[in-house]
C-alpha cells in the first residue's frame, strides 16, 4: 500500500486519476525492468523505491505541462526502458504512443512490456530519429514529442522537433541546470520551427532530484533539410 499511496499522491498533484489497474500495471512494469535488467542494461536504478520515485514519479510530473493532457498522439524519442512513454500510456489510456529507440534489445523489452501489460494503441520503432523524421508517416505528425534522453537541448531539438505538427509541442525532460543549454539552443530551436514557451521546475519528493521540463511550441514547419544526416547533428549542433 505504501507505493500505491505514493503514486496516488503524485497523480493527485497533477490532476490524474489513479486506480488499482494503473497501479498493478506500473508494478508489473517495475518487475519486468528488474528482470530484464539482469540480461541487458536498461537502467542503473534497480531498487523498488528508487524505480517508483526516480522513474515513475518523474514521468508522472510531465503532466504538469498542460499540452500532455490534451494530446492525442505522442512520440517518445530515445525511450530506452520506456520512460516516459509507457508510464504516460498507463496513466492516459486514450493517447496513441510511439516509442523510438536505436537498440533492438531495448525494443524487444518494450514489446514484452506492451504484451504483458496488454497496452493498446502503442507501437515501437527501431532505428534513428534522423531517419524516421524524414518519413512521411512520422514527419510533423505528432501532437507531442518528448525525450528524457541524455543529450544537450540543441541536439535533442533537431532530433525531436521535426516529428511535431505545427501547433504541437516538444517537451524536453532536463536536469537541474538548464539555463546555459537553453541559451545555447535558442537559435537552433528557432531554425527548426520552435519557440520556448515555458520552463517548469520539478522536485521529486523524498529524493535529491530536481528537474526541468522545457516546453517548446512548434510555431512553423521544419525546413526539409532538418534533421540532418546521422552523425552530423551531434558533431555540429545548430547555432
Curated annotation (Swiss-Prot):
Q: Which SUPFAM superfamilies match?
A: S-adenosyl-L-methionine-dependent methyltransferases (SSF53335)
Q: Where does S-adenosyl-L-methionine bind?
A: 78, 83, 129-130, 148
Q: What would be an example GO MF term here?
A: rRNA (guanine-N7-)-methyltransferase activity
Q: Where in the cell is it found?
A: Cytoplasm
According to its UniProt record, this protein's enzyme class is transferase
Query: Which E.C. number(s) belong to this protein?
Result: 2.1.1.-
UniProtKB keywords? Cytoplasm, Methyltransferase, rRNA processing, S-adenosyl-L-methionine, Transferase
Gene Ontology CC? cytosol
Q: Which InterPro entries has this protein been placed in?
A: rRNA_ssu_MeTfrase_G, SAM-dependent_MTases_sf
**Source organism superkingdom:** Bacteria
Q: Record's Pfam families?
A: GidB
What the record says about family reads: Belongs to the methyltransferase superfamily. RNA methyltransferase RsmG family.
Entry function: Specifically methylates the N7 position of a guanine in 16S rRNA.
Family annotation (NCBIfam families)? rsmG_gidB
Supply the name of the protein.
Ribosomal RNA small subunit methyltransferase G
Source organism per UniProt: Clostridium botulinum (strain Hall / ATCC 3502 / NCTC 13319 / Type A)
